[in-house]
Amino acid sequence: MTDEVAISSGLSEEEAKKRAVKGYCVYDWGKSSFETSVVTAILPAWVAYLFLEANGLTGNILGIEMTADAIWSYAITIAALSVAIVSPSFGIIADRRAIKMWWLKILTWLGAGGTLLLAFAPLLPISTQWVWLIVMFVFANIGLNGAGVFYNALLPHMGEDDEKDAISNRAFAYGYLGGGLLLLVHLGMVMLLSLIHISEPTRPY
């Protein structure tokens, strides 16, 4: 992998290795940020709020009464099952073919695109905003988990056997830092919006 980077970028092998390791770690930064803010902390609460505004405590989905928590669980399950079905094929590709980076890029773009499109939910009617968020989240989560197959397959190419633990630990550290910082930013934005909403004068009707 580092040889390919060196050839394509014109860098020395040592510089290419440092660049590849840095990219590997920064990817974990972004992946952990998604998992922390989108999967765990912010988006579930946003979906639940919008679902409550549109349907009340429960809504009739395909003839079944569901809560927001149930729908969120189904969304995660659909994404996980989708990746589980294709993971064996992805694993074969990752192990036997030198196209890991191509698939990693494609699936990362899918995940990043789905995440970006979450921001367009406020442009829709309140009754369909939560539906948009769920659909985009499923695509984003499929991209994240699918890309993870190829991301994990890159570690053996990042360095020698005695370097892999240090590289993996460094990537984890980047991930924790990135996830934590973005969560703080998002929580700060939520608190700021709450304060602005509270401070707005009540309009007489």
What residues fall within each predicted segment?
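Loop-to-transmembrane helix entry/capping segments in MFS-fold secondary transporters
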Residues: 69, 161-172
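C-terminal ends and interior cores of transmembrane alpha-helices
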Residues: 108-127
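Single conserved hydrophobic/aromatic residue that forms the stacking wall/gate
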Residues: 196-205
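Hydrophobic core of transmembrane alpha-helices in multi-pass small-molecule transporters
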Residues: 114, 128-147
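Helix-loop boundary and gating motifs at the non-cytosolic
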Residues: 12-80
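Cytoplasmic membrane-interface "Motif A"-like loop-to-helix N-cap segments
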Residues: 94-110
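Intracellular juxtamembrane helix-capping segments at the cytosolic ends
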Residues: 146-159
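Glycine-rich segments within core transmembrane alpha-helices of 12-TM secondary carriers
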Residues: 168-190
